[in-house]
Amino acid sequence: MTAGLSTRRLRFVLLLAPVVALAQLPPPPPPLQPLPPPPVPPGNPLTPAKVNLGKALFWDEQLSSSRTVACGTCHRAETGGSDPRSVSGLADATAPGPDGMLGTADDITGSPGVVLTDAGGAYDEAAVFGLGVQVTTRHAPSFINAAYAPNLFWDGRARTTFLDPVSGDTVLFAGGALENQCTAPPVSSVEMAHEGRAWTDAAARIAAVQPLALAAFIPAPLQGWIGTRRYPQLFAEAFGSSDVTPARIALAIAAYERTQFSNEAKIDSMIAGTTTLTPQQQAGQGLFVGSGCAGCHAGSLFSDNAFHYIGVRPTADDPGRFAVTGDPADLGAMKTPSLRNVGLRSSYFHDGRFKTLEEVVAFYNRGGDFNAPNKPPVIRPLGLNPVQQANLVVFLREVLTDPRVARREAPFDRPSLYSEDVMVPTIEGGGSAGSGGITPKPIALEPPLTGNPAFTVGLHGALGGAHAVLVIDAAEPPSTGPAPASASFARVDVILLGAGAGQGYGSTVLAIPNDPALVGTRLHGRWYADDPAAEGGVSSSQAFSFVVFGPRGDGLMSVPPAARSTPRALQLSPGRPTPFAASTLIAYELYTAASVRLVVYDAQGRSVRTLVNGATQMPGSYSVTWDGRDGGGRPVSAGVYWYRLEGAGGGQTVRTVKLD
């Protein structure tokens, strides 16, 4: 319901407002037309091979320097094409606004990316985030139906002409916004890249790795097409030669994205005349048109693909379209998102400030929150009562959602990601404090995949400038120093950077041997740092553990070896982190399609919050963030909680602890 129109269109929309100067009923809207497939530029025709290649690349975390982020990490169908991790109020998804400080009104809900890393894989300290995962400064828009837009990103900086990211030669004269858009994240040191990464580095990585080596539950048609081939062979089928180039990567990903359009929502059945809306849905649709929403969220795409300032934040916070055009009329203006599948999304607007459609409708009902000369009159208090607001939400949530998108059904099926899987290293307990009473913390995020030449493990919160030792062993290293003199897997000495109590940080880059015999081996690690203020002169971090896995486990890598012969329908994992203060990520896997319920209970067995309620989900890995609140949005007290997953005739329960 973004707004901001030319004078002529604005006058037309104002005629549709609930209160009109001429005291006449608004004219009926023009009939909606069926949504056709998106346009395809002649220079990048769709072929099955190119689409399959693009699908593999889109979901391959190996495209990132850290091997932890794919395009699909931030763009998933089940959350309407946006990022399920991006939830307002979650610390791990919060970036500072223009004031540069966290915890203030201009904070942004973005997408977690990567730890700031140098070209050798060592971690650097980033402003605000330190050695934590950095967060983007805008909320990730949906990739579903993005192919209809002539310009992409919230500010439209991905334009229609696509230039080779290396040579600068024109590849597509028009229609190349998708190709342009997908060239940015793989070289962003916040989203996917190490500092100074060139596109040639990313292409070289892809040329050398096994396709989707980190993925599980690869859709059968895609896995059958890939077979045992490597990327150069896949590029040869898609493009006629085996060259893996940056431009070809972009062309393939864009080809796949052009197949990701949704046109089987209830609104499409209504357009086709095969179904009718309920009275409440009809009332919501009438309000959608009569209140002016349809002016910008126009046509069967429910977007005009234009840019408008609507008062989400002051124009000084984010220049929006102005940064591209230099036109003062574009200050703070953002691209109108399509409202298809909007009910599945976890955050709304370019800054992700709202969690629910109810909040979004309330925002429009009060006429936005800020004003500027370029804010159009159509953004004004609407005077909708609670029933009307609820009807509008029902229309948006129920009528515009394509069930294939919600259920991850083809063409919206996908592999599961390493970052969703239980194979991500787990931070455990223990540790001993050093100077300032601070216990050092380990950083273990990257995949312990056999053959991974750059498995980086970091430390922060120790004494700056101190000597530190990383120990990784088959048994958990002791929780207090000194560091063991030897280890079965790795023992590495590091001089920490930084100065002062709790300011020391460092990392080391290890190689996971390409040895199949290691698959299934659980290893445990801990850091030790010299510190005269620590007991015995040595502080120690919490322990961490991980299981070495092999490529393309198809879900088997997520099941303990002893259980692999035991049929099961689902697997529930401990929350990350546990214990937790602000939020915990609950991951689970389904080995068969099932109607799923995931419920949080307190220590007395009382239901606290239903996180998933009867949704039918396809086989794959899923994750849900619990923000430590009950069903009414109130923070729960510290203590023990249980969450239970039920589906396909089975169930599992896991314990977690909420801290103050």
Functional labels for PLM-detected ranges:
Residues 2-57, 80, 189, 193, ...:
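Post-cleavage N-terminal segment of exported redox proteins
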Residues 24-171, 265-373, 407-423:
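Short glycine/threonine-rich turn/loop motifs
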Residues 341-413, 460-465, 507-538:
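Extracellular low-complexity, Gly/Ser/Thr-rich intrinsically disordered linkers
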Residues 420-561:
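N-proximal, solvent-exposed segments at the start of the mature chain
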Residues 455-462, 584-590, 626:
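Aromatic/hydrophobic beta-strand junction motif of beta-rich domains
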Residues 470, 527, 556-563, 575-578, ...:
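Terminal processing/anchoring signals of secreted or surface-associated proteins
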Residues 557-601, 610, 647:
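Glycine-centered coil/turn sites that cap beta-strands in beta-rich domains
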Residues 610, 625, 634-660:
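C-terminal tail/sorting-segment detector
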